[in-house]
Structure formats: structure tokens, C-alpha cells
Swiss-Prot record:
Residues 41-61 are annotated as: TAD2. GO terms for molecular function: DNA-binding transcription activator activity, RNA polymerase II-specific; DNA-binding transcription factor activity, RNA polymerase II-specific; RNA polymerase II cis-regulatory region sequence-specific DNA binding; sequence-specific double-stranded DNA binding. The gene is SPIB. Gene3D superfamilies: Winged helix-like DNA-binding domain superfamily/Winged helix DNA-binding domain (1.10.10.10). This is Transcription factor Spi-B. Belongs to the ETS family. GO terms for cellular component: chromatin; cytoplasm; nucleus. It comes from the Eukaryota. Changing residue 144 to A: Reduces interaction with IRF4 and transcriptional activation. It comes from Homo sapiens. Pfam families: Ets. One of its GO terms (biological process) is cell differentiation.
Length: 262
């Protein structure tokens, strides 16, 4: 009967006694690619041995002969976004070819572009009328020529009247004053003083119209056409009416006594 003995430890090597009584060396079954327990270097992976020197030496590098060019055909593809320490989302460009399904973004030279100022449509400035372009401190002037137009003139009151006393002057009053005083006889004159009929001069009627415009303080030039329109409007109130004669008009009879007293 064979006696089984325990495995014997002989140094760093192990031996095992099998039932047939033959000892087998376990080290002979160990693969040569692994280091042993003593840390011996592997024969296949010997890192301490320097690599063999190639037979042909490397050519000397000549910086002058080397020519570098900008990779024009290289396409930029963007890797997955990364977060910078400041918390901003940034895209890291890469020179690798874009993967399938990822679009390639063409490079653009922004330095060669010329910036052009944006064109804006001119904003139309408001058109100022003749009344709006007056200075703010200028006195208000009357420009209408209807029969109700009245100019402010200094009142004929005496020294005891208040300063700045003014009264309204109407067109028929202006004409009555000229006819009564005999002013501007070359422009207007009596035809029948007792009946209150008067006539304008066809030659100097515009001069009389300008005088009335100055009396009113109009900025626009007064014409006889405007003055005649105001006289026709007086027919509604009865102060003056048109006579069937060229450039001839007649005052209302109620105004004649005032003319005689003047």
C-alpha cells in the first residue's frame, strides 16, 4: 500500500507526490510569459533591454527644406459639448473626420469679410406749416380773410384809458375810415356819398388790399380777390352789399349816419 505524503516545499519550487510515487516539478508547467515569484524579468517582455538600433540611420531634418501649408481640406467636426469651469457650454472642435450622421460645418474666413453699415429708410420729417414755423415768442397773427376777421389796433381812447386798451377793427370799418378821411383816393372813392356807394380802382385795388393785410398783421400777402370775397360775405350780415357795377359796393344805411358824424 502506497503511503501518501504531504506536498513538500523545496525552496521556491513546489513538488507533488502522486499515487504512482513519481514526483512532478510544477515549475515545468509554468508559462514562460509570466515572471516567477522572485520577480525575474520575462524573456518575452523584457523592458530593461534597449530596443535594437535600425540598420539605416534617420535622415537629418532640414527646417529650410520643409514646407508647411495650412490644411485647407481639413473638416472640423464638433465633439460632444463640454462644460467649462465658468459654467458655459462650449463646443470643442476636432480635426477628425465627422462620424456617420454628423454634418460637417464648412470653415468661413471672417477676417476677409467687409462690414457694411445697415441701411435704414430715411424717416420723413414732418412738414411744418406756415403757422408752425413761427417762433414761440412771436405774436399770434390772423391769416383768414373772412368777413369775421378782425385786427387788433390801438384804441382811440384818451389818456385816462387803461394802457393796452384795444378794440377790434373789421373790414367795413377800415373802408369807412379811408373814405371818410379821404385817404388812398387813388384806390377807393365815393360814387354816391349820400347812398353809401363807393368804388375800387381797377389799377390800384391790389395796393389797397395790401394795406388791409398790413393793418390786420397777416403774414400772407393779401390780394384783392381775398378782400372781395370778404365783402361778398358781408351780404349775409347786411353791412355791405354788391352793386351791379364793376368794383362797386354799397354800405348799409344804418352805417351812414356814423359816416356823417365823422
Amino acid at each position: 500500500m502506497l503511503a501518501l505524503e504531504a506536498a513538500q516545499l523545496d525552496g521556491p519550487h513546489f513538488s507533488c507526490l502522486y499515487p504512482d510515487g513519481v514526483f512532478y516539478d510544477l515549475d515545468s508547467c509554468k508559462h514562460s510569459s509570466y515572471p516567477d515569484s522572485e520577480g525575474a524579468p520575462d524573456s518575452l517582455w523584457d523592458w530593461t533591454v534597449a530596443p535594437p538600433v535600425p540598420a539605416t540611420p534617420y535622415e537629418a531634418f532640414d527646417p529650410a527644406a520643409a514646407a508647411f501649408s495650412h490644411p485647407q481640406a481639413a473638416q472640423l467636426c464638433y465633439e460632444p459639448p463640454t462644460y467649462s469651469p465658468a459654467g458655459n457650454l462650449e463646443l470643442a472642435p476636432s480635426l477628425e473626420a465627422p462620424g456617420p450622421g454628423l454634418p460637417a460645418y464648412p470653415t468661413e474666413n471672417f477676417a476677409s469679410q467687409t462690414l457694411v453699415p445697415p441701411a435704414y429708410a430715411p424717416y420723413p420729417s414732418p412738414v411744418l406749416s406756415e403757422e408752425e414755423d413761427l417762433p414761440l415768442d412771436s405774436p399770434a397773427l390772423e391769416v383768414s380773410d373772412s368777413e369775421s376777421d378782425e385786427a387788433l389796433v390801438a384804441g382811440p381812447e384818451g389818456k385816462g384809458s387803461e394802457a393796452g386798451t384795444r378794440k377790434k377793427l373789421r373790414l367795413y370799418q377800415f373802408l369807412l375810415g379811408l373814405l371818410t378821411r379821404g385817404d388812398m383816393r387813388e384806390c377807393v372813392w365815393w360814387v354816391e356819398p349820400g347812398a353809401g356807394v363807393f368804388q375800387f380802382s381797377s389799377k390800384h385795388k391790389e395796393l389797397l388790399a395790401r394795406r388791409w393785410g398790413q393793418q390786420k398783421g397777416n403774414r400772407k400777402r393779401m390780394t384783392y380777390q381775398k378782400l372781395a370775397r370778404a365783402l361778398r360775405n358781408y351780404a349775409k350780415t347786411g353791412e355791405i352789399r354788391k352793386v351791379k357795377r364793376k368794383l362797386t359796393y354799397q354800405f348799409d344805411s344804418a352805417l351812414l349816419p356814423a359816416v356823417r358824424r365823422a
